[in-house]
Amino acid sequence: MATATPVQQRAGSRASAPATPFSPTRLSRLQEKEELRELNDRLAVYIDKVRSLETENSALQLQVTEREEVRGRELTGLKALYETELADARRALDDTARERAKLQIELGKFKAEHDQLLLNYAKKESDLSGAQIKLREYEAALNSKDAALATALGDKKSLEGDLEDLKDQIAQLEASLSAAKKQLADETLLKVDLENRCQSLTEDLEFRKNMYEEEINETRRKHETRLVEVDSGRQIEYEYKLAQALHEMREQHDAQVRLYKEELEQTYHAKLENARLSSEMNTSTVNSARGGMMESRMRIESLSSQLSNLQKDSRACLERIQELEDMLAKERDNSRRMLSDKEREMAEIRDQMQQQLNDYEQLLDVKLALDMEISAYRKLLEGEEERLKLSPSPSSRVTVSRASSSRSVRTTRGKRKRVDVEESEASSSVSISHSASATGNVCIEEIDVDGKFIRLKNTSEQDQPMGGWEMIRKIGDTSVSYKYTSRYVLKAGQTVTVWAANAGVTASPPTDLIWKNQNSWGTGEDVKVVLKNSQGEEVAQRSTVFKTTIPEEEEEEEEEPIGVPLEEERFHQQGTPRASNKSCAIM
C-alpha cells in the first residue's frame, strides 16, 4: 500500500510557515490519490470479472487459472515495484517540501538580519559622520588653542624679555641704592665729623672767650694799676677806647663764628637734602621696579596657568580623538566582519537552496516518469477491460487552478483503498480565484482557506494606527467581525496575522495576534473579508471563490494487441534520463 502524509502534519507545517492554499505538493498528491484510487477500483473490477469468467468458463478453468496466476504474479511484482518507487518519491517530495519551507523561513530570517545589519551599518555610518564632524570641530578648536598657545608663548617670551630688562634695571637701581646708602653713610659720618668739629670749635671759642676775658681782666687790672698813675682825664678816654675795642673784637669774633656756623649748617643741610632726595628717588624707582616685577610675575603665573590648561585641553582632545578613531576602526572591523559572515551565510543558503532546487527538479523528473508509468499502466488496464468487455469506470481527475499561479502542477497524495464494489465517480475540476483591492496603506495579503488566519500588510513607509479598525469576514449570509485595540499600531512594511483560537499558535504581538473568542474564521465556497477604518470607511477587501466544473470524458485509447509485449518509453527532462524496460504479457 502507498504511504500518505497526514493532513494534520501539513496543517502544522502550514501554521509554522504559512503557505498558499492548495500548494502544488498537496494538489499533486490529491491528483495521485484520485488516480490510484481509480486504478485500484478498476483493478478490483477487473479481478472480479476474471473470477466470474473463471466460474462461467469451467472448461477453461485450468488454463485460465494458470494464466491468471502468471498474470497475478506479474501484476503483483509490478505493483510492489510501483508502490515502492511511489513511496520513495513521496517521501522524497515530502522531505524536499519540508526542507524548502525550512530554507524559505531561514532565508526570510537571514534577510531580516541582513536588513537589520544594513540599518545598523547606516546608523554606524551616521555616527561616523557625526564623529568626523566632532573631530573636525575638535581639530578647529585645537588649532585655535594652538594659535592661542603660540600667542601666549610669544607674550611669555616678550614678558620674559621685559622681566630680564626689569631685572637689569632692578640690579642697576639696587647698585644705585647701595651707592646712595654708602653716600648717605659717608654724609652721616661727615655730618658727625662736622658736628664734632663744630662742638670742638664751640668749645675752642668758649675757651678763647674765657682766655680773652681773663686777658681782658688781666689787662683791666693792669690798666687799673696804670690808671692810678694816669690822670683821671685820660682814664675815661682810655676805658672808652678799651671798651670800644673789646666790643669790636667781640662783634668781629661773633660774626666769624656765626658765619662759620651758617656755612657749616648750609653745607650740612644741602648734603642732607641731596642724600634725602637721592634716597627718595632710589626708593621710588625700586618700588616701581618691584611693582613692575610683581605685575610681570602675576602675568607670567596667569599665562603659565593658561598654558597648562591649554596643554591639558589639547592632551584631552588628542586622547578623545584617538579614542574615537579606535572606536571607529573597531566598529568598521566589526561591521565588515559581520557583513562578510552574513554574506558567506547567504551564499551558503543560496547554494543549499540551489541544491534543493536541483533535487526538487530531479524529483519532478522522477515524478514525471512515474506519471508516464501510471499512464502506461492505465492503458494496459483499459486494453484488458476492452478486450474482456468490462465496463470501465470513468476517470477521476482533480485539477486546481489559482489566479495567482502561472503554471499547473500535478501532485499525488493519499492512501489507496481496495474497493470490493464497483463504483463510478464523476470527473471534476476545482478552480480557486482570488481578488483583492485596497484604497489605503493597509491591504489584506492572505486568507487561509482552512479558516485559521487572515494576514494584513502595511505597504506604505509610515506607521498606521489601527485603533478602532474593524475586519469583517463574510461567508454567504453569515459574518463575524474583529476589532483592533485602540493602541495598536501597524509599523511601516510590517505584516500582522490574526489567528483563530484553535490554530495552535501562540501570540507574538505585534506580528501575531490571537482571536480568543473565535475558534475559526470559517470556510466556504465564497469567502470575503472587508477592512474598515475607525470612521467605518472600507479601505481594503479580499475574496476567495471556489468553482467546481465537470469536464468531458477523455477519448479511449486504442486496444493493445493481446499477447504482445509492451515496452515503456524512456523519458528525458533537462538531461536526466529515466528509463524502464519492463514488459508485460497480456493474455
From Swiss-Prot:
The modification Cysteine methyl ester is found at residue 584. PANTHER family: LAMIN DM0-RELATED (PTHR45721), LAMIN-B1 (PTHR45721:SF3). The keyword Kinase does not apply. Residues 390-409 have a biased composition (Low complexity). The gene is Lmnb1. This is Lamin-B1. InterPro entries: IF_conserved, IF_rod_dom, Lamin_tail_dom, Lamin_tail_dom_sf. Glycans are attached at residue 399. The modification Phosphoserine is found at residues 16, 23, 28, 126, 158, 200, 232, 278, 302, 375, 393, 534. There is a cross-link at residues 102, 123, 145, 157, 181, 241, 261, 271, 312, 330, 532, 547 (Glycyl lysine isopeptide (Lys-Gly) (interchain with G-Cter in SUMO2)). Residues 70-81 are annotated as: Linker 1. A lipid is attached at residue 584 (S-farnesyl cysteine). Residues 82-215 are annotated as: Coil 1B.
